[in-house]
């Protein structure tokens, strides 16, 4: 597991491009036959990828978390971003199709990731600290309601799925969902916002090899950008905007953790303020 320490905004605005990428971008999340994890000190979230090819992979942090097992004091949200796969929780196995979600609450000791049939499952997950146990729940993308948002004139027509949140799958503090931009639409989260009470992570998906998203971050009056490719994630501290525009349409998985569990708790940034 790799540490990603917190960064003060006064420090971040002086970073070079390389330093911004080193602290906030996760470039290589998915590695075959490996559990790859990043420990962000922004609200203590663990960002990870598991790509089981030859055999199943256990959810195990070794000695890093100083607990007897990964979910002893944590909860986790999982999305399969590859071909069909399964997550085994204790004696129960949950089959996840492409972009299906699974929530696993505190106290579940044995968790394993595996591929089905021809292989190719690819699991993305976010874990946050937890104080109460909630039941394991699966959400199939094909069965989920969504909010249709945006306008063609603003190039931001999109479908937003809220999955783990106060009115959906229950958790202690983790919130998670996915947003799909429609063809010929490229902007997400603009006008921008911040939420000083929780951090957020974006995982960008469905981008061609030569397509990129220009992800904007930083304080509203000190924005910077990261050039992001397919299956790369961005850590957004509570003080940072998180918005982007792509060279094509795409989708992104968003996940939040922190003090407030209200999805609409955000502070809008007027367009005449952002710099």
From Swiss-Prot:
Binding residues for Zn(2+): 193, 195, 200, 242
UniProt cofactor(s): Zn(2+)
Pathway info: Glycan metabolism; pectin degradation; 2-dehydro-3-deoxy-D-gluconate from pectin: step 4/5
EC number, as in UniProt: 5.3.1.17
Alphabetically ordered keywords of this record: Isomerase, Metal-binding, Zinc
A molecular function (GO) term: zinc ion binding
First-level EC class: isomerase
Record-linked CDD domains: cupin_KduI_C, cupin_KduI_N
InterPro entries: KduI, KduI/IolB_isomerase, KduI_N, RmlC-like_jellyroll, RmlC_Cupin_sf
Catalytic activity: 5-dehydro-4-deoxy-D-glucuronate = 3-deoxy-D-glycero-2,5-hexodiulosonate
Origin: domain of life: Bacteria
Family statement: Belongs to the KduI family.
Cited function: Catalyzes the isomerization of 5-dehydro-4-deoxy-D-glucuronate to 3-deoxy-D-glycero-2,5-hexodiulosonate.
Protein name in UniProt: 4-deoxy-L-threo-5-hexosulose-uronate ketol-isomerase
The species this protein was found in: Bacillus licheniformis (strain ATCC 14580 / DSM 13 / JCM 2505 / CCUG 7422 / NBRC 12200 / NCIMB 9375 / NCTC 10341 / NRRL NRS-1264 / Gibson 46)
Gene, per the UniProt record: kduI
């Amino acid at each position: 597991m790799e540490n990603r320490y917190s960064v003060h905004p006064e420090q971040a605005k002086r970073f070079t491009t390389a330093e911004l990428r080193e602290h906030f971008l996760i470039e290589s999340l998915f590695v075959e036959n490996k559990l790859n994890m990043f420990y962000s000190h922004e609200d203590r979230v663990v960002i990870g990828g598991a790509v089981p090819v030859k055999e199943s992979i256990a959810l195990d942090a070794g000695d890093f978390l100083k607990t007897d097992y990964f979910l002893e004091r944590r909860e986790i949200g999982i999305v399969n971003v590859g071909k069909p796969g399964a997550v085994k929780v204790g004696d129960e196995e949950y089959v996840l199709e492409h972009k299906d979600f699974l929530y696993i609450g505190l106290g579940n000791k044995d968790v394993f990731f595996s591929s089905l049939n021809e292989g190719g499952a690819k699991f993305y997950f976010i874990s946050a600290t937890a104080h109460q146990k909630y039941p394991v729940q699966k959400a199939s993308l094909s069965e989920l309601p969504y909010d249709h948002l945006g306008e063609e004139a603003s190039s931001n027509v999109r479908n937003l799925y809220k999955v783990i949140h106060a009115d959906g799958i229950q958790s202690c503090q983790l919130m998670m969902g996915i947003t799909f931009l429609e063809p010929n639409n490229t902007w997400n989260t603009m006008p921008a916002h911040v939420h000083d009470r929780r951090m957020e992570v974006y995982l960008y998906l469905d981008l061609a090899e030569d397509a990129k998203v220009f992800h904007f971050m930083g304080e509203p009056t000190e924005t910077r950008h990261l050039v992001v490719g397919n299956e790369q994630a961005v850590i957004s501290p509570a003080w940072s905007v998180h918005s982007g525009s792509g060279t094509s349409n795409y989708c992104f998985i968003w996940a939040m953790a922190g003090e407030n569990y209200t999805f609409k708790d955000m502070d809008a940034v007027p367009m005449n303020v952002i710099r």
